[in-house]
Amino acid sequence: MLQYLEHQNGVKIAVDYFSCTFPLKLQEDELELIVIEDLVKYIGEFLNFEPSEINKEEYSTNRFRYQYTIGNSIILRLSGPELLIGYRSCQIELKGQGCREFENRSNKTWNDLFSFFLMRLHGNPTRID
């Protein structure tokens, strides 16, 4: 969609903030932390970051149990409040520098990012600026 708008209007559209929540789905016999580590690796690979560039923080905010920093500015929060569908919520947040880091580090477009989180991870965008 962004590519279409840019092409139609002849202007470059910049995303300066993106936040999305998505469910953490666990099977009965799965250990939460193992699933979380796999999910962090999966998201890191999509964003084109090495495992050494993903750091687990000692704290988290907004009632999430785990928080990771991907690169310098991309925040991933996991295992948050329980959703109506019985799963725990997760959140990805890219502020200004995180948005630029995504654009500069990846060969992917914003449409790729939206598709990954909204379709593949069944996410719900909470804010796009």
Write out the residue ranges for each language-model feature.
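Structured, helix-rich domain cores that form ligand/interaction pockets
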Residues: 1-129
